[in-house]
Regions:
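Short, Lys/Arg-enriched N-terminal segments with co-localized hydrophobic residues
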Residues: 1-8
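Hydrophobic, aromatic-enriched alpha-helical segments typical of multi-pass transmembrane helices
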Residues: 10-240
């Protein structure tokens, strides 16, 4: 009876982690879908940044898309909580202070994820709305002022987000989590860097500007976390058979 109870306890945690990872992956999918809505547009060589894009400025971009992006972000932001739970549960219980710091940074990330998502979506909305009405130069000036003004509040929000995933990355690298080090290949930090740098490398190699570059870079963070959630769920599944 004692052996069966011990076996049950050993299988319960992996089942919880799998559930959390699946819910987290769904949440990241919602967030990434919003990013794809913003980034899936025809690009030109002159396009720069998050909103200085000819397609937005022409008014051709559907104003309903940023609205849907925010709606998807609300659901995704809520489900991000399960990503935080899964990441925190990975870290060895011996490192209590580290777990607490990582968890608090993760909870802060959940709290501000929709704020950042909305900020980016509203820049696309304003650019699309203002471009045909007040001219491209005036629209860019107005949205740039909005971006720079809000950046004072937005920029510090990235610090706890970086810590939440950075701490987990370091603990995994040091062998202080439940996973093997080869799982670093699927870590959000690894994939985020990959998805951000690939379009830059392509442009450096003089590959013509294309929609996939915008989609890949804009959705890099959420797509990277989704990759981890799926990989972690598969890992847990294979180790509980």
């Amino acid at each position: 009876e004692l052996q069966s109870e011990t076996k049950k306890m050993k299988t319960e945690k992996p089942k919880k982690l799998i559930r959390w990872c699946i819910l987290g992956a769904v949440g990241c999918g919602f967030m990434a879908a919003g990013d794809w809505l913003l980034g899936c547009i025809p690009l030109r060589e002159t396009d720069t940044g998050l909103f200085n894009r000819a397609y937005y400025l022409s008014g051709s971009y559907g104003l309903w898309k940023p609205v849907l992006t925010v709606g998807l972000g609300a659901v995704g932001g809520f489900l991000y909580y399960f990503v935080v739970k899964a990441l925190n549960a990975d870290i060895d219980t011996k490192y209590r202070k580290t777990k607490i710091i990582q968890y608090l940074c993760g909870i802060f990330t959940v709290a501000v994820a929709l704020t950042i998502h909305t900020w980016v979506a509203t820049m696309a909305w304003f650019t699309t709305y203002l471009g045909p009405r007040i001219g491209e130069e005036a629209a860019i000036a107005a949205v740039t002022a909005y971006q720079d003004g809000m950046l004072l509040a937005i920029a510090p929000m990235y610090v706890p987000m970086i810590l939440a995933f950075g701490i987990h990355f370091v603990m995994l690298l040091a062998g202080k989590t439940r996973y093997s080090r080869w799982m670093l290949a699927f870590h959000p930090v690894t994939w985020n860097l990959l998805l951000v740098t690939v379009p830059d490398i392509a442009q450096a190699m003089q590959v013509p500007v294309a929609t996939w570059m915008s989609v890949m870079s804009q959705s890099s963070t959420n797509s990277a976390i989704m990759v981890w959630c799926i990989a972690a769920a598969v890992y847990e599944r294979s180790h509980t058979q």
